[in-house]
Amino acid sequence: MAYGALTLVWVVLWRFPVLMADDRFFAIASELPRGQQTWAVIEKMFDDCWRLINGRLADGFGTMLFALGNTALRLAMALFYVALSAILWCYLRLSAEALRRPLPRLSLGTGSGAAWICWSLAAIWPFTLIGLSTGVAGESVMLMAAVWNYMFPLALLLFALYPLFRRWAGRPMPWWAELLSVPLVYVSFLMHELVTVAGAVLVAVALLTARSRVWTVPVGLITASAIVGVYVKFTAPGLRARTETYQGIDPVLLTSLRAKAVSAAMALNLWPQRDLKLLLVLALALGLAVHMAWRSGRFSTSRARLLLATLSLMFLSVLAWLVANMHFIREQRRVGTTDLDAINNLLGEAIPVLAAAGGFVVCTLVVVFLLPKGFLSPLTTGTLLAAFLTTGAVAYSSSPHYAWVHRTFYMPGILAVLVVVMICADVLSSAGEATRPETRTTSLLAPVLLVLVGLHSLVVTGTQLAANWAAWRNVEHQVAAVKAGQQDTVTIPITLPCSDVMWYFNGSNLERTAHQWRIYYGLDRDVPVRVRVPETVHSCPIQ
């Protein structure tokens, strides 16, 4: 029943999103109305994405999903989120069992409160992320292209690695189930380069931290599949082509060490700008873990002081990151954001940003490794490492042309919020062993607060999506009137009431936008489609 309710929520939400520019690129690939596709174009899209565009197998699924029809497409978007929440709940239980403090099963009886809170965290994490990350609702969570690029590959990866982690936890699945995961691991590693990085980290964690014998023939095949997947993914021709997109530009301006440092700082500036609350919540979650470990008497006073000092430095590094970011942006605006030569002279401003970000990472890892052994699950630590490594990968491969695009950090953002969820689950399972009632009460504070943040964001996001769809209905009525011969022109609004659930709605080329909508709605070429500021501008009902 719980998953039925969760599915219903996602199905209702996915009735409303209007296609963004990235979505429309795939929707009109076959130049047929309403996202219809030919098999030849689907095959070509897979081939082009792998060889020419970005080296991602995931993007090839865009046209395939549109070919299913609008209803099935939106149902698939909903089910991808439900699937990831379900597999996350399985990992939370598996992680607790590996630490010998299992979470109880979901039930309506007494003693299952902690389990329900953990399940709620796993179910509502996308909305918790929305509450902690500015603009991520429209830029990533409710953007179809982001769902099949990030959510689907991550859900597939976790599903494929589940037999390996069952063996890691000492509860191996049948050998045939482990063998079936071998091709799935390989395919998941080809989907998206950031998923590949995360997958490599998780496989290493499973192999290096297992308490019992883990090496078997199926595990060896899974490991080999992962290694081959990493090699094939990072030698994909499209991945290199993506870094060579900008023709006519001096390569030194993009690939020199100075350029890499400045571009990385530009990209990392997005964290204090857009994800400051997420950084602080991660630090607070670790602070709660330190407090709970100290209350349980599991480390000495000297270690407690060291942890407290490191936590303080962790918060100070976030503040330093924010200050360095403000200075960098001020100088960037002074020299002009489009002048690559001038931007590359901002090395002096970039170094403090990189140092502050690096300080936050180091302090976080020190806190994690100073905690008593077994307090946090190795899976939590591995996910944290994956979040940091994927962030580093995005920063390293960034270019001044798209360093401002927050969506590039969607995967690290997902992993970061999952780390927070896992820390809360570890704390709750640890509190189950505590004898003091106040200890158990303290362990509930952060998880319950995160659930409330998620519920609030769910209400806000749903209301904003519905408001945008209500405004977009006018376009649907215009299309119907044109096809009925009742009017000659279709006017597309240049924006919709609630910008928080929009990203790259029209793009920079309005003529291309009009062309895309003309194809999508199956309008004749001689029908004028204009992208304009609407005559009646509706305000967003909730912010």
Where are these regions (language model features)?
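Transmembrane catalytic cores of multi-pass membrane glycosyltransferases
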Residues: 11-75, 144, 193-407
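C-terminal structural cap/anchor segments
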Residues: 370-377, 395-464
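Alpha-helical transmembrane segments
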Residues: 1-10, 121-127, 180-182, 220-227, ...
